[in-house]
């Protein structure tokens, strides 16, 4: 069937900011889809609010709108652009929900816009729990006994009929948001209340729990001619009951018999055909491990997280082909771009095993609830490919970057058996390590299988690894054993630990014995046909399929899994760096471990190595490829952390050199550099012991800012007000040592701003200065950043440019650098310098139209800034105002405090741009889903130190129609200063309504809550913040952000004046 000629212009909706449940996979799929449609000659209009994405680059679509994905703004763009069709299936749940809203509000019908890929009826049938249930019954597909409810009372009634345990699944939500498992009525009421609130259609499915069944996924494709195929099946290591995004997943499925595979495959194909989906679809099924009984859990009628995994696992580009199918092409007409010899109708075949492991944020959120369930908690994931399960699992494990290189974590051998078994039973994020420890203690597989419902097959594979550890320990320096364990994925570091020697000794011994990895190609067809794809993974086998060209090459290290502090921004920089390398005439090689990202799309680079980013794995690729050099600047802290070992091994690091990286990161060297350059910084010291820290703080004076050196995202950073808190921090938050000192700085309360700059060693280019709305103390990644700056004087700007030049030349920076400043009493201080790309690079690249990563890469490769057209020093500012605002995932992370501070908590970002600050702020808040009505009730509960400022803020909110509610201390202060307030209680004050109840009953439209450092753990304040998050009420923990919101509301308000 030829492609359609009756449509010319197609709008694609992106997925917005990265949040838990919806990450970089939609940048990958959206980019693929836009390019695929352009390839077919269609005009593509893209709407997305996330500036950190490749898909929002100008060359990906014909017209790019970085605007809020809300009904108001998408409708405006539709009216302006008048596209013929809309493709909503590549923007995750955000895209689907927006398509539904446009349809229900009559916009699509009014503007005569057709939905492509998946019809509204199919979205409804898959997402609306009632219609889905009816469809499954019509198809004779089994689903767990369930009831659709629109109220808590209906949920209780159903529970009384069938009993517990139950699972609550809200309709039209993402990553299991609002859902969960219930063992009793109290839990049912709590979860259903949240679920109904979070479901855009106020609907939940309450179903009998089938926790303990195997969870299997099928990624399927269908075209308009009813051709359908299975791209990939996947099996979760964890049973039903743990969200698939939080589970270890293997592809292809490992424990299914032919009969079971055929049964579930037929069911998946029946479902996609019945839904008449044209494109990709994900079907999740539960299989009874003891019979052929199965249930359909759910269907995602769109490209999903699993689609990205299936694409990278097989090499089959699902999103690219889904876009072509959406415009009428059929699977037997489209050539598979990976083989270039077969058609897309051929089902991929795998001759390897893929393991996906989730990356959790609990290293940042130690107070978070680590128990896994039906609501997703992982921020990102890694993928590894091997020839056997053990190899792929161990490679995935060391890709996580959580400080482990094997399925063993420190101190577990000291854990009691009772604690061990409890941790295994509870199913937390680190259960895999506890299972391995239990096997080391000779617990039987049967016992562990009964505790966890994990298939014995997988537990047996863990036992193989544990037995090999034992074999290694008993046969020190045995070459044959070394060869055996390398085949099973053991790292040099893990072997060194068991042999009690260092990693270099293992590496040298292995190389002398000729035990070297080979690289195999991912080709979608298990080598059955010729393939042209340069997509490789390592294994210890015989034939090497990665052929080395004569062309000079450059290796770029990616940034690994998405986590808080290191998000998709670094992948954006990596992709642009590769583009510049290719333009400069070199062969570009990428090494990365993240299946969600654009950088691991095989078409981006000349060669892709899907490998862990560890010293061993990187050196193996370098030994084979012998590149001219390695670029580390765009891989975040992941790549920078490898600099020392790579340099020691004689690898040529391109750009800023190791000794200069150290001068920026090492406290004493950095202080000496600043002194030599005559640049002020807040007074500070380095401490390697608790007593040194206390002495340093006494010299500086409290409050002080404390943090470990060499961190990203402000991990373990804290503002400390007194000696007691400092001692507590030194003994619990960090392990200080001469190798890992703690930095102690004066905490300056002032205006914060930052610059990204490019240096060629002689001149610098500063694309722009970003001014933070929140004052110093809130992590830069959690602050709203404004470009160009709105309140900085010319003198301050000149000083910032001068200091940036001095630092760039003084630190011998070649390529990117990021500098953060604080301005107090009109004096500029340097807080920190990062001689690498930062998370603001994509935002600044978009708003200045300078492709910063490309320019920096060419400079790194020897070009000079004089050869570009951007000039030197500070680039002329934009006429528009642009705001980068953070996006948070607190709804997914129970027990995590939403109070902002020096440790980063946001998972993503959005951008708002307009002709003035107020309009840009409005767009930024809307894009971040922080919406406030023009009037209502606002609660103030603030720290004593903030009361004076909060009073002025409350007065202006009152002036535009808000009624001020306040807790006792705040109310007394407000009343004494002439501001009338409604007194409210905190918790347990039964004589009046307390805040959580008011929030729950919809009486409060916003909460402003600030806490002094001594009261951070205040239980009442924590519950108030949590209530606001759970009920979707705007929460401000910084008065600066609340003031920015006031500016928006004020700009929307009319002046009402009595006639004089």
Curated annotation (Swiss-Prot):
Coiled coil: none annotated. The keyword Nucleotide-binding applies. Mg(2+) 3 binds at residues 820, 832. Mn(2+) 3 binds at residues 820, 832. Residues 547-929 are annotated as: Carbamoyl phosphate synthetic domain. Mn(2+) 1 binds at residues 284, 298. Large subunit of the glutamine-dependent carbamoyl phosphate synthetase (CPSase). CPSase catalyzes the formation of carbamoyl phosphate from the ammonia moiety of glutamine, carbonate, and phosphate donated by ATP, constituting the first step of 2 biosynthetic pathways, one leading to arginine and/or urea and the other to pyrimidine nucleotides. This is Carbamoyl phosphate synthase large chain. It comes from Streptococcus agalactiae serotype III (strain NEM316).
């Amino acid at each position: 069937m030829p492609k359609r000629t009756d449509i010319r212009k197609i709008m694609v909706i992106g997925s917005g900011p990265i949040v838990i449940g919806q990450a970089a996979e939609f940048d990958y799929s959206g980019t693929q889809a836009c390019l695929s449609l352009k390839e077919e000659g269609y005009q593509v209009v893209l709407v997305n609010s996330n500036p950190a994405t490749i898909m929002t680059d100008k060359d990906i679509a014909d017209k790019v709108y970085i605007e809020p994905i809300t009904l108001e703004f998408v409708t405006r763009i539709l009216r302006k652009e008048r596209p013929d069709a809309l493709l909503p299936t590549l923007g995750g749940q955000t895209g689907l929900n927006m398509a539904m809203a446009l349809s229900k509000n009559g916009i699509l019908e009014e503007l005569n816009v057709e939905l492509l890929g998946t019809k509204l009826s199919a979205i409804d049938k898959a997402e609306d729990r009632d219609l889905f249930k009816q469809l499954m019954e019509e198809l004779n597909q089994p689903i767990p006994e369930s009831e659709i409810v629109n109220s808590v009372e209906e949920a209780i009634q159903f529970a009384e009929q069938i009993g517990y345990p139950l699972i609550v699944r809200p309709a039209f939500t993402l990553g299991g948001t609002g859902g969960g498992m219930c063992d009793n009525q109290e839990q049912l009421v709590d979860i259903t209340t949240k679920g109904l609130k979070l479901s855009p259609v106020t609907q939940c499915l309450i179903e009998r729990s089938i926790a303990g069944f195997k969870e299997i996924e099928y990624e399927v494709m269908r075209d308009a001619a009813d051709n359908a195929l299975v791209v990939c099946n996947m099996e979760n290591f964890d049973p039903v009951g743990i969200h698939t995004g939080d589970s270890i997943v293997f592809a292809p499925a490992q424990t299914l018999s032919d009969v079971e595979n055929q049964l579930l495959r037929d069911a998946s194909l029946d479902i996609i055909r019945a839904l008449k989906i044209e494109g990709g679809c994900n079907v999740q099924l539960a299989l009874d491990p003891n019979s052929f009984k199965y249930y359909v859990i759910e269907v995602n009628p769109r490209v999903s997280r699993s689609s990205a995994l299936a694409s990278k696992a097989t090499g089959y580009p699902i999103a690219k082909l889904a876009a072509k199918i959406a415009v009428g092409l059929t699977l037997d007409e489209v050539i598979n771009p990976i083989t270039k010899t077969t058609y897309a109708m051929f089902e991929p075949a795998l001759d390897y095993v893929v393991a996906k492991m989730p990356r959790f944020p609990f290293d940042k959120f130690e107070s978070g609830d680590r128990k896994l369930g039906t609501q997703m908690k992982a921020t990102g994931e890694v993928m590894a490919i091997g020839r056997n399960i053990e190899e792929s699992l161990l490679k995935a494990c060391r890709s996580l970057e959580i400080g482990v290189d094997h399925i063993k974590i420190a101190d577990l051998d000291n854990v009691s058996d009772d604690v061990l078994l409890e941790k295994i039973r509870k199913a937390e994020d680190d259960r895999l390590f506890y299972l391995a420890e239990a096997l080391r203690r000779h617990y039987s597989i049967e016992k562990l299988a009964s505790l966890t419902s994990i298939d014995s097959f997988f537990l047996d594979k863990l036992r193989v690894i544990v037995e090999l550890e034992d074999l290694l320990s008993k046969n020190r320096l045995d070459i044959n054993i070394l060869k055996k364990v390398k085949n099973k994925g053991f790292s040099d570091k893990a072997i060194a630990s068991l042999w009690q020697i260092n990693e270099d000794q293992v590496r040298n011994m292995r190389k002398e014995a000729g035990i070297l990895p080979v690289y195999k190609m991912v080709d979608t067809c298990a080598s059955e046909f010729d393939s042209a794809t340069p997509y490789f993974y390592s294994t210890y086998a015989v034939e090497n399929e990665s052929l080395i060209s004569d062309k000079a090459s450059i290796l770029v290290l990616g940034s690994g899994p998405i986590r808080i502090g290191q998000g998709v921004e670094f992948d954006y920089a990596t992709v642009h760096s590769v583009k510049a390398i290719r333009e400069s005439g070199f062969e570009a090689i990428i090494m990365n471990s993240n299946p969600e990202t654009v950088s691991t799309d095989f078409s981006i680079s000349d060669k892709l190595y899907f490998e862990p980013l560890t010293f061993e794995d990187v050196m193996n690729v370098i030994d084979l490829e012998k590149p001219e050099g390695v670029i580390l600047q765009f891989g975040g802290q992941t790549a920078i952390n490898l600099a020392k070992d790579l340099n020691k091994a004689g690898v040529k690091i391109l750009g800023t050199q190791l000794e200069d990286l150290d001068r920026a990161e090492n406290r004493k060297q950095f202080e000496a550099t600043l002194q030599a350059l005559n640049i002020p910084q807040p007074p500070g010291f380095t401490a390697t012991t608790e007593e040194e820290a206390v002495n340093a703080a006494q010299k500086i004076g409290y409050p002080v800012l404390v943090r470990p050196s060499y961190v990203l995202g402000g991990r373990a950073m804290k503002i400390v007000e007194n000696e007691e808190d400092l001692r507590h921090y030194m003994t619990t938050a960090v392990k200080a040592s001469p190798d890992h000192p703690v930095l102690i700085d004066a905490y300056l309360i002032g205006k914060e701003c930052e610059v990204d700059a490019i240096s060629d060693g002689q001149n610098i280019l500063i694309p722009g200065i970003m001014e933070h709305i929140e004052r110093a103390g809130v992590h830069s990644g959690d602050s709203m950043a404004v470009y160009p700056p709105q309140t900085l004087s010319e003198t301050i700007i000149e000083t910032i440019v001068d200091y940036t030049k001095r630092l760039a030349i003084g630190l011998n920076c070649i390529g990117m650098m990021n500098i953060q400043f604080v301005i107090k009493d009109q004096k500029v201080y340097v807080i920190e310098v990062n001689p690498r790309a930062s998370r603001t690079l994509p935002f600044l690249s978009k708003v200045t139209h300078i492709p910063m990563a490309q320019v920096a890469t060419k400079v790194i490769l020897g070009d000079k800034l004089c050869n570009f057209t951007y000039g030197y020093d500070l680039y002329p500012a934009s006429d528009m105002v642009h705001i980068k605002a953070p996006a948070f995932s607190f709804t997914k992370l129970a027990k995590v405090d939403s109070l902002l501070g020096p440790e980063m908590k946001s998972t993503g970002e959005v951008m708002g741009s307009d002709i003035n600050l107020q309009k840009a702020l409005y767009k930024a808040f809307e894009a971040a889903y922080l919406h406030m009505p023009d009037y209502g009730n606002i609660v103030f509960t603030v720290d004593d130190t903030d009361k004076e400022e909060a009073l002025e803020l409350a007065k202006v909110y009152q002036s535009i129609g808000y009624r001020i509610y306040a807790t006792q201390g705040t109310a007394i202060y407000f009343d004494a200063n002439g501001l009338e307030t409604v007194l409210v209680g905190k918790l347990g004050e039964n004589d009046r309504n307390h805040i959580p109840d008011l929030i729950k009953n919809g009486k409060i439209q916003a909460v402003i809550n600030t806490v002094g450092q001594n009261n951070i753990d205040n239980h009442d304040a924590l519950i108030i913040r949590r209530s606001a998050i759970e009920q979707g009420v705007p929460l401000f923990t910084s008065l600066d952000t609340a003031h920015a919101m006031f500016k928006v509301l004020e700009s929307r308000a009319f002046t009402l004046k009595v006639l004089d």
